[in-house]
A protein has these predicted regions:
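Conserved polymerase palm-domain catalytic core
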Residues: 3-4, 72-172, 176-192, 207, ...
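Short acidic (Asp/Glu) and glycine-rich catalytic loops that position anionic groups and cofactors
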Residues: 18-20, 50-54, 89, 171, ...
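Conserved two-metal-ion catalytic palm core of "right-hand" nucleic acid polymerases
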Residues: 1-107, 115
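Active-site catalytic microenvironments for nucleophilic, acid-base chemistry
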Residues: 44, 48, 154, 158, ...
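Short coil/turn segments at secondary-structure boundaries
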Residues: 11-18, 52-58, 86-92, 122-127, ...
């Protein structure tokens, strides 16, 4: 690494604001020049050091993957498990307040395993502690997504190599694992809880459950079964609300039809991935 690029780089404090969708969250944002440094840091170094070693079952914030592919991957796993086991069990895990509870010292130690360049280590520490606290990553920073993925890659590797779980999928802090029996599901979940608490200082929240395969699983905004993938009712309600809001904006002259359609086009992929017949027609029945 060229030391000239980092020796005079000072990462300054970040600003914060709140968003209410999909729930109340504090978003912390670095100044423009720091955001340039963050992108350079992730794209030129973290990709090389860490992303190549990620499990194939990790889907968040990775090129060529994403939420929709994660859902399709879970569905393919379910089809396969139905063929080999017929009935099986689903462990659905969700980490409690994930970004807020990441232990920076543990994360830094994980990063140090692969990063040996002293200048890059210095910059890593500067970025990691830029908000002045020892626990939690700022939601909104480009580096936070990468750091968060690296942190739970520890869980991916534990499930794969220690627990010998073949059928898992993780989208950031949402995790699905498929196992043969209820007994195995309980045993594996208990081991995962212990690993998260002892090694990463994390806990699973109350959404974490064990289901029979016939119930399917809620994951990344979809209700997934082996041969059906539907948008959850909560997602449908949000889409309907957005469509009505845009109709009102257009009627009041606050937005053009072209602008409204451009906004809606971003949601069509979300709908088209699912096996939801006529939903698009119902949502967009009214001409905007």
């Amino acid at each position: 690494m060229n030391s000239k690029k980092t020796e005079h780089t000072d990462i300054v404090a970040i600003t914060s604001f709140y968003v209410t969708e999909p729930k109340l969250r504090r978003i912390e944002k670095s100044i423009y020049i720091d955001r340039i440094v963050h992108r350079w840091y992730v794209d030129n170094f973290m990709q090389e050091y860490f992303v190549k070693s990620f499990s194939y079952s990790s889907f968040a914030c990775l090129k060529g993957k994403g939420m929709h592919n994660a859902c399709l991957y879970v569905q393919e796993m379910m089809k396969h498990c139905k063929r080999i086991w017929n009935n099986y069990y689903i462990i659905k895990m969700d980490v409690a307040k994930y970004f807020q509870n990441i232990d920076k010292q543990i994360l830094y130690e994980i990063l140090c395993r692969k990063i040996k360049d002293k200048n890059l280590l210095w910059l890593t520490r500067e970025i990691l502690y830029s908000n002045g606290i020892d626990k939690g990553l700022p939601i909104g920073n480009y580096t936070s997504q990468c750091f968060a993925n690296i942190y739970l890659n520890e869980l991916d590797q534990y499930m794969k190599h220690k627990l010998k779980l073949k059928y898992t999928c993780r989208y950031m802090d949402d995790v699905v694992a498929l196992v043969n029996t209820k007994k195995e599901a309980i045993e594996k979940l208990n081991l995962i809880r212990s690993f998260l608490k002892e090694k990463l200082c994390l806990e699973l929240n109350r959404k974490t459950q064990i289901f029979q395969s016939t119930q399917g699983v809620n994951f990344c905004g979809y209700k997934i079964n082996a041969y059906r993938l539907k948008i959850r009712d909560k997602g449908k309600r949000k889409l309907k609300k957005k469509v009505k809001f845009l109709e009102k904006q257009v009627k009041q002259g606050k937005m053009t039809c072209i602008e409204a359609h451009k906004y809606l086009s971003g949601h069509l992929g979300y709908i088209n991935v699912a096996n939801t017949k006529n939903l698009e027609n119902k949502l967009f029945a009214t001409e905007i």
